[in-house]
Amino acid sequence: MAEVVQSGPVEAQARHVVYCGVCTLPPEYCEFGGTAKKCEEWLKEKQPELYQRLHSEEAISANLSTLSISAQERAAKDAAKKEAKAALAEARDAERKAASKVQIKRVERNKRKHVTVIAGLEVYGLENKKVAKELGKKFATGSSVTRSAAGNEEITVQGDVSDDVQDWLLEVYGKEIPEANIEIIEDKKKKGSS
């Protein structure tokens, strides 16, 4: 008896897609985001063969030759507009970072109990939950992310560790946060009239 080999449907292979490290889109779509120049630099550094395929002179001239003259002019205007917008947003972000302060407050809870409250870290691109967890491990205290009355997130660390927190922030996140932008504030609770 002859054995019949059944050829069933061949399983499709998964396609490997490269995603941009700047805008998290596939490199073919980076031009539609606001960070086209940064994306192009990332692609040139990390994926040179894909960069050659997308941004070489031949590829650009081939794409432009399919467009009409008015469409080429429009594309050039749009690209210039997006580039100017991205540069303006970057300048605004840098200005905001330079003007903002990280406030470390020492707040009195009871007679001899204190908590340290850190506000303003999110401006520098730091995740409050992650920093709170690191602070809790570093100082062996409880730390949590809370909302202030103004609606901003702040990190509350149990204990009077304001000076140590400042030193730790400069040591660990010194690249992101300049020393001049960290200020320590001592806040005393007013005694209630009883």
Swiss-Prot record:
Domains: entry comment: The SUI1 domain may be involved in RNA binding.
Coiled coil segments of this chain: none
Gene symbol of the encoding locus: tma22
Native organism: Aspergillus oryzae (strain ATCC 42149 / RIB 40) (Yellow koji mold)
Pfam family name, one: DENR_N
Subcellular location: Cytoplasm
GO cellular component: cytoplasm; ribonucleoprotein complex; ribosome
GO molecular function term, any single one: translation initiation factor activity
Keywords carried by this UniProt record: Cytoplasm, Ribonucleoprotein, Ribosomal protein
Lineage: Eukaryota, Fungi, Dikarya, Ascomycota, Pezizomycotina
Self-association state and partner proteins as the record states: Interacts with the 40S ribosomal subunit.
A Gene Ontology biological process term: nuclear-transcribed mRNA catabolic process, nonsense-mediated decay
Protein's recorded name: Translation machinery-associated protein 22
Keyword Ribonucleoprotein part of the UniProt annotation: yes
Source taxon at top rank: Eukaryota
Span of domain SUI1: 102-173
